[in-house]
């Protein structure tokens, strides 16, 4: 195999294993020929490791001696493997008595050959429910930039760098850490998640998770204090032996992802010693390399397990999905199991899929696929099943420190918190104490029961949000003092629509005395009272104006004011025509405000007959005619209403008795009909014009035939001015004055 030295050396090296032979070769000073690099699997190392897991350290040394190989495992490796090994299925008594030595190993291999590799599972990976941004295009296409920070450089402290990045985060903070015991860094993450609403994801190593929980005990924190933070545990790959014995490695990755734009990765751990005494280094990375860290975090999050007490909206006590049955029950003599010996099958790279992919299956380890040797209780077991299977719940372990627990996460620390010196001085940590804080608050790790309100991002959830804070209730709380007409919840937009008539009621009362004049039948108002009885589906005008519904808004007041204010007498229209016009006005509420004003002059001018004898109603056109102020301020009403000012018999539809009346019509005396604005100058002008008209016409006709002058016709030809002071509105009004527009309701 190795040529050159001599027969003795050749014989010794020919019988040695690959590692021993290479070491012996490198120890010879005169050996100048370099060996080619061989990347291959060592079968001797696999046999030795399997012997260590199955029969202990003595069997491991025996295999090393037989294979003429060096003891490649250190004492640290041996201790970790023997302390974290998990057992496989055992042979029956009959098979155990019949088989021994190689036959026993062969039987074990036949029984468990299908369990050497992970089994396919239908368990969905956890979702990044708090939100996860996409990698910006500028980051994905820009070149990689790296800045190195050494802990030895006191001017650029690594902890200060991390705290600064946490304070500047806007979209997401993702932390993958082995040990997390620094309280200041946890406070920075809590401030970012709670105060600024930045989603925070923590993936902590399973092996050292107990230290993070101890820190939370000292700070009296639980899952309720971290509503916008997800804490999960992760572990390394699982090594399986030929006989089914296996152990799980540690998660030693350490990096921080900020806003999917930059990454801080290195050897720094979130501990006080690393910030003050231990030396470490980190790399601050930007550019397209961030996409690789983004993908790696998604894969780690998909493999992670929830931490009891810090799982947020996910309850670890309730199973998310049923896991496969135990391996020993899945394989029977009559059930063939496929065997495979490909080295690549031991890799868990096949499960590395994005957790955002819905209903995607990935590979899980047989028997649950969890890191049970270190501790977090599997999410597939409920409280009753966990008690039956011999796994005491976290609450029982914390409430009973003397309770014997299996080797796991809470065995060394959380199960014996009462024995620690700091637990004697902290009422939140000493569970045996009867302090008011412990009795009232209980365990700070276990979450308190509260109703969970789930919101779907990107969807309008206002209409589904309960008024009284209970998810199952659809009734508004009577303590709020809010009146809701019905059992269904109202949106803010509907409430604004219902409140708009009542808010504009003050403007209508100041500027439009029409409804009350119509009710009382004031002879000086120029309005025909509705003397007939109301129909079954009709309300009084005042009730319509005060109704909070959308149908009785300002448009309803406008349509009814226009429909009755211009009628010269009660008998001018037949009952059928009156019903037809009321039906038309009711349809106008769905046509828009501009259509109401466009329809009014033409339709009213066509349906009001000319009266030659108006002596029967001498008091209908008295000097104190009320102005109809109908507050509309939209631009389309100004542009569309202007051309109708000079058409028909006039805006009010009053008869023109003789041509002599129009001869003396002056523009200075024409009264303007102001459309409802709450500005003080409009109200002042209204009262000034009202007082001036009463002063100039003290002897107006109170009875007899109306043929005494031009002032009556001047009062009848009123302009509908939409009092806007903007220059552009006036310009558009003058431009559209001569356009001929026709209403859609004109016959």
Curated annotation (Swiss-Prot):
Q: What is the effect of changing residue 293 to A?
A: Diffuse cytoplasmic localization, loss of localization along fibrous structures, possibly due to loss of interaction with CSNK1A1
One GO term (biological process): signal transduction
| Posttranslational mods | Phosphorylated in vitro by CSNK1A1.
The ranges of region (Disordered) come to 322-352, 374-412, 462-484, 517-550, 588-633, 646-672, 692-715
Give the UniProt keywords, A-Z.
Cytoplasm
**Which residues fall in a compositionally biased region of kind Polar residues?**
390-402
Primary localisation category: cytoplasm
Similarity annotation: Belongs to the FAM83 family.
Subunit structure of this chain's protein:
May interact with RAF1.
Q: What is its biological role? A: May play a role in MAPK signaling.
- Return the protein name: Protein FAM83C
Name of the coding gene? FAM83C
């Amino acid at each position: 195999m190795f040529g050159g030295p001599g027969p003795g050396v050749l014989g010794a090296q020919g019988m040695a294993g690959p590692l021993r032979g290479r070491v012996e070769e490198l120890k010879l000073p005169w050996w100048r020929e370099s060996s080619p690099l061989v990347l291959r699997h060592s079968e001797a190392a696999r046999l030795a490791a399997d012997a260590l897991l199955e029969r202990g350290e003595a069997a491991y040394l025996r295999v090393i001696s037989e294979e003429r190989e060096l003891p490649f495992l250190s004492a640290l490796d041996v201790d970790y493997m023997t302390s974290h090994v998990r057992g496989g299925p055992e042979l029956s008594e009959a098979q155990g008595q019949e088989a021994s030595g190689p036959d026993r190993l062969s039987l074990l291999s036949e029984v468990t050959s299908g369990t050497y590799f992970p089994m396919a599972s239908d368990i969905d990976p956890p979702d990044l429910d708090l939100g996860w941004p996409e990698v910006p295009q500028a980051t994905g296409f820009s070149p990689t930039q790296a800045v190195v920070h050494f802990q030895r450089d006191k001017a650029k402290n690594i902890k200060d760098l991390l705290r600064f990045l946490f304070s500047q985060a806007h979209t997401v903070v993702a932390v993958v850490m082995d040990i997390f015991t620094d309280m200041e860094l946890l406070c920075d993450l809590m401030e970012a998640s709670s105060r600024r609403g930045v989603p925070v994801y923590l993936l902590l190593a399973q092996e050292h998770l107990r230290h993070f929980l101890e820190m939370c005990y000292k700070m009296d924190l639980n899952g309720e204090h971290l509503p916008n933070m997800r804490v999960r545990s992760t572990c390394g790959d699982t090594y399986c032996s030929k006989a089914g014995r296996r152990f799980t490695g540690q998660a030693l990755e350490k990096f921080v992802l900020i806003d999917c734009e930059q990454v801080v990765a290195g050897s720094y751990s979130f501990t006080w010693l690393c910030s003050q005494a231990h030396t470490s280094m980190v790399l601050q990375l930007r550019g397209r390399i961030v996409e690789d860290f983004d993908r790696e975090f998604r894969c780690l999050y998909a493999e992670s397990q929830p931490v009891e007490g810090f799982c947020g909206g996910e309850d670890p006590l309730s199973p998310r999905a049923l896991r496969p049955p135990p391996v020993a029950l899945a394989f029977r003599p009559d059930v063939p199991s496929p065997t495979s010996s490909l080295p690549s099958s031991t890799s868990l790279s096949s499960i590395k899929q994005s957790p955002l992919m819905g209903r995607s299956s990935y590979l899980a380890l047989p028997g649950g696929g969890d890191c049970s040797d270190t501790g977090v209780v599997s999410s597939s077991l409920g409280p009753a099943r966990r008690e039956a299977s011999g796994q005491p719940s976290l609450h029982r372990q914390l409430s009973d420190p003397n309770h014997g627990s299996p080797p796991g996460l809470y065995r060394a620390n959380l199960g014996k918190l009462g024995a620690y010196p700091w637990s004697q001085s902290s009422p939140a940590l000493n569970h045996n104490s009867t302090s008011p804080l412990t009795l009232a608050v209980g365990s700070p790790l276990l979450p308190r029961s509260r109703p969970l309100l789930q919101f779907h991002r990107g969807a309008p959830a206002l209409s589904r949000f309960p008024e009284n804070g209970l998810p199952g209730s659809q009734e508004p709380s009577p303590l709020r003092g809010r009146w809701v007409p019905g059992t269904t919840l109202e949106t803010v937009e509907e409430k604004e629509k219902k409140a708009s008539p009542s808010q504009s009621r003050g403007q209508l009362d100041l500027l439009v005395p029409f409804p009350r004049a119509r009710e009382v039948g004031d002879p000086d108002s120029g309005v025909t009272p509705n003397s007939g009885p109301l129909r079954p589906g009709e309300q009084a005008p005042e009730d319509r104006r005060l109704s909070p519904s959308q149908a009785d808004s300002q448009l309803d007041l406008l349509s009814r004011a226009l429909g009755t204010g211009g009628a010269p007498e009660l008998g001018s229209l037949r009952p059928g025509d009156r019903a037809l016009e009321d039906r038309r006005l009711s349809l106008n509420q769905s046509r828009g405000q501009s259509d109401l004003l466009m329809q009014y002059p033409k339709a009213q001018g066509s349906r009001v007959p000319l009266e030659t004898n108006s002596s029967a109603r001498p008091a209908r056109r008295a000097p104190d005619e009320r102005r109809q102020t109908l507050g509309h301020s939209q631009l389309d009403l100004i542009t569309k209403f202007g051309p109708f000012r000079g058409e028909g018999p006039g805006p009010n539809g009053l008869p023109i008795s003789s041509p002599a009346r129009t001869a003396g019509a002056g523009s200075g005396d024409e009264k303007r009909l102001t459309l409802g604005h709450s500005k003080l100058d409009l109200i002042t002008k209204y009262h000034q014009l009202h007082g001036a008209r009463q002063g100039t016409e003290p002897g107006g006709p109170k009875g007899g035939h109306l043929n005494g002058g031009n002032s009556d016709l001047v009062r009848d030809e009123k302009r509908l001015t939409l009092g806007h002071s903007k220059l552009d509105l006036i310009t558009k009004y003058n431009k559209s004055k001569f356009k001929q527009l026709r209403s859609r309701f004109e016959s």
